[in-house]
Amino acid sequence: MSMLKNLKSPAELKGLSVKELEVLAGEIRTKIIDTVSQTGGHLASSLGVVELTIALHHVLNTPVDKIVWDVGHQAYAHKLLTGRLDRFDTLRQLGGISGFPKREESPYDAFDVGHSSTSISAALGMAAARDCKNGKEKFVAVIGDGSLTGGMAFEALNQAGDQNKNLIVILNDNEMSISQNVGALSSLINRKMTSELVVRLKKEAENFLGHVPRIGKDLLKVARKAEESLKGFFTPGMLFEAFGFDYVGPLNGHRLETLIPALENVANLEGPVLVHVVTRKGKGFEPAEKNPSLFHGVGPFDKETGEVRASKGGPASFTGVFGSTLTAMAEKDDRIVAITAAMLEGTGLKEFSKRYPSRFFDVGIAEQHAVTFAAGLACQGMRPVVALYSTFLQRAYDNVVHDVALQRLPVTFAIDRGGLVGADGPTHHGVFDYSFLRHIPNMVVIAPRDEIELQRAMLTGTQHDGPLAYRYPRGKALGLELPDSVESMPIGKGEKLRDGSDAVIFALGVVCKEALVASDILAGEGLSVAVVDPRFLKPLDQQLLIAEARRTGVVVTVEENVRQGGFGSAVLEMLADEGLAVRVLRIGLPDRFIEQGTQQQLYARYGLDAEGIAASVRNFMHHDRGDASSTALA
């Protein structure tokens, strides 16, 4: 009989023995492996926290008590324990459950996450709200050691300690960043100190020593120094105690018989407490334990062998082209340095890091620092290339404006995962960068339509004396044969790809490919539609675009970005400034967060594939007035 299938709510965990909970942990791991082997997802992180998740739900009264998961990569066991077993096979699929905690999905999901280092801030805010209402519920932030490289986490630790809030922070140390398990003695010392009685006795002893005549304060200082020296010698606890937290741990995150009592003791303590739990990423699946980075975010794989199913041949990815090209460029230009924020492999920079270790910087999950660090490099004559996912560049917006663009520094931004990314959904789609970059003074923004244009954009970036960004998508490139050498692009110059007399499509970025196919479809219906690749979001090629708009009288803009403030808006502004009365249809993403699904499903749903573009143009041409996505200038 399956314990997982019969579990109605996490409250039932309180009635199970440790042996039964261990059986349940095994069933959860099996279900996660079975599902992710089919759907893909964040496997290693979730396998590493199965026992921790069980222990938290065993000790806490969820959903009254709240667990805030940092990033959310590790939340699969949490989802299985909180009523989503029957839908777990839809994980990360169109219309299915999210790969991250999502408040609208379950009352057990306390906070929507997807980006790193936010959990302590959110949980602290919830604790402050509780105190305003004189509540008693508990709030727990679960954060990985990698996420602690984000400065926001330390900002929250600082406030929590200063305000002495009742808050529990679980540091999930999966041996990837901070520390190894530091041994039995340290574990024993700290585990003994979790007892509520011991903590109370410790405080009473401090009070007693403090009141001893004449020498009391000196005795108290000596006692505290002795305690700190002993613990600091064996553990990293002093760091967190300096923030005003009581430190507990390290604890073995896979031993329920010790983890549960420790958490029960911690739950009754006053003030902020940090519990250091050591886990193994990929626990229970040998291939993931041996290669946790590969199985961090993984596609479908063979669950018997762990072999990841290779995609069907085809061209290299845009990311791969970027990485190999930058490595080759760095051989010819020793000013080029590469910077990423804990995304070495994701941004394609592994080979660069091996070839040029002194010119490669992984700054951790610290996008703000990455950008200003690059600004410092640029000040001293280097040509830094900051490689970030579009969604994470959002976190460094002020640094882009204030520290780079304001000084017109030659920093290049390689914006990966631009546009719709697929199964990771709304937290990871890169659909706002056109809008938040194009209004920044001194900024040049390029959206290459293919891998050759990407190479040209990269060369342009390292030659340009000012900030420049180029944006490319997730997934395979077009399969074009790459030349031995490329030329840089003239700033602000687009290219006409196809002539036509009835209308013109301005398609920015990789949607050029779909626009050309749409033009073919429409040609078969008797409509002659030109296609222009503007290349540059900023500055626009006004001479080319205005000439084409004036010639045809009908303009269609296509972009893989929200329509608000994006490329279509830039074209409208240009035409309005010119006083040119033409009909304009903007095709892009609507004013809402876009759900998860495959890239192809989402392109079709939002009319960004060839058929969708052709249908929109057809309808626009056959009606005197367009739909809500169109704008007429008169």
UniProtKB/Swiss-Prot annotation:
Report the GO molecular function annotations.
Answer: 1-deoxy-D-xylulose-5-phosphate synthase activity; magnesium ion binding; thiamine pyrophosphate binding
Pathway given in the UniProt record? Metabolic intermediate biosynthesis; 1-deoxy-D-xylulose 5-phosphate biosynthesis; 1-deoxy-D-xylulose 5-phosphate from D-glyceraldehyde 3-phosphate and pyruvate: step 1/1
Query: Which InterPro entries does the record match to this protein?
Result: Dxylulose-5-P_synthase, THDP-binding, Transketo_C/PFOR_II, Transketolase-like_Pyr-bd, Transketolase_BS, Transketolase_C, Transketolase_CS
> Which keywords fit this entry according to its UniProt record?
Isoprene biosynthesis, Magnesium, Metal-binding, Thiamine biosynthesis, Thiamine pyrophosphate, Transferase
**Pfam families according to UniProt:** DXP_synthase_N (PF13292), Transket_pyr (PF02779), Transketolase_C (PF02780)
Indicate the enzyme's highest-level EC class. transferase
Cofactor(s) needed by this chain = Mg(2+); thiamine diphosphate
Q: Which domain of life is it from?
A: Bacteria
Q: What is its EC number?
A: 2.2.1.7
Q: Does the keyword Cell wall biogenesis/degradation apply?
A: no
CDD domains with a match to the protein in the record:
TPP_DXS, TPP_PYR_DXS_TK_like
The UniProt record gives the binding positions of thiamine diphosphate as: 73, 114-116, 146-147, 174, 285, 367
How is the cofactor bound, as the UniProt entry phrases it? Answer: Binds 1 Mg(2+) ion per subunit. Binds 1 thiamine pyrophosphate per subunit.
GO (cellular component) term, any one: cytosol
The processes (GO biological process) annotated in the record are: 1-deoxy-D-xylulose 5-phosphate biosynthetic process; isopentenyl diphosphate biosynthetic process, methylerythritol 4-phosphate pathway; terpenoid biosynthetic process; thiamine biosynthetic process
Per UniProt, where does Mg(2+) bind?
Answer: 145, 174
Protein role:
Catalyzes the acyloin condensation reaction between C atoms 2 and 3 of pyruvate and glyceraldehyde 3-phosphate to yield 1-deoxy-D-xylulose-5-phosphate (DXP).
- What subunit structure does UniProt give? Homodimer.
Q: Which NCBIfam families match?
A: dxs, PRK05444.2-2
Annotated PANTHER family:
1-D-DEOXYXYLULOSE 5-PHOSPHATE SYNTHASE-RELATED (PTHR43322), 1-DEOXY-D-XYLULOSE-5-PHOSPHATE SYNTHASE, CHLOROPLASTIC (PTHR43322:SF5)
Q: According to its UniProt record, which protein family does this protein belong to?
A: Belongs to the transketolase family. DXPS subfamily.
Q: Which HAMAP family match?
A: DXP_synth
Q: What is this protein called?
A: 1-deoxy-D-xylulose-5-phosphate synthase
Species of origin: Syntrophotalea carbinolica (strain DSM 2380 / NBRC 103641 / GraBd1) (Pelobacter carbinolicus)
What is the gene called? dxs
